Amino acid sequence: MSDSEFLPQEGPKAFALVWRKVMLDPRGFYRDMPATGGFENPLIFLGVCGFVYFALRVVVFGLPDAINTIFLIALAYIFGPGILMLASQFVFQGEGDYEGTLRLCAYAGACLALAWIPALGILAYVYSLYLIFLGMEKVHRLDTTKAAMTTLVALVVTSLIIIWV
């Protein structure tokens, strides 16, 4: 079983192994994560995290809130990777591509499994930004400052898009 790539055919144990590695050893995870290999496995991983988030958010906050929140999260995952990639490449001369950017964002979605908890929700979102920052360093070969600036630029632009929707 690999802890650097989620393989759905290996079942729930594989999900738990990858989730644990992303959350507890993100530098090691992103170091070992292949920047290529397709969209399917990372998006399934993100989908499982999103389902856990949605189901538990329904229980805690009710269906209307859960639907609204999952819609906004989906928008962030639709626009966010593209904005990250464009900011990285055009502003900071990053070397990565869209596939690697989407993969790092999908695995940063591991935080969704904790974001439904009222007291921890905001911390989970902040930690997901940290995970994206770490992934940007590796996938786009950016130094720490450029990775941080890219993450902040993408956060601001994505937030503005979500606010306008």
Task: State where each predicted segment sits.
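N-terminal juxtamembrane cytosolic/stromal segments of multi-pass membrane proteins
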Residues: 1-52
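Hydrophobic alpha-helical transmembrane segments in multi-pass membrane proteins
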Residues: 42-84, 103-130, 150-165
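Alpha-helical structural context
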Residues: 33, 90-91, 116, 139
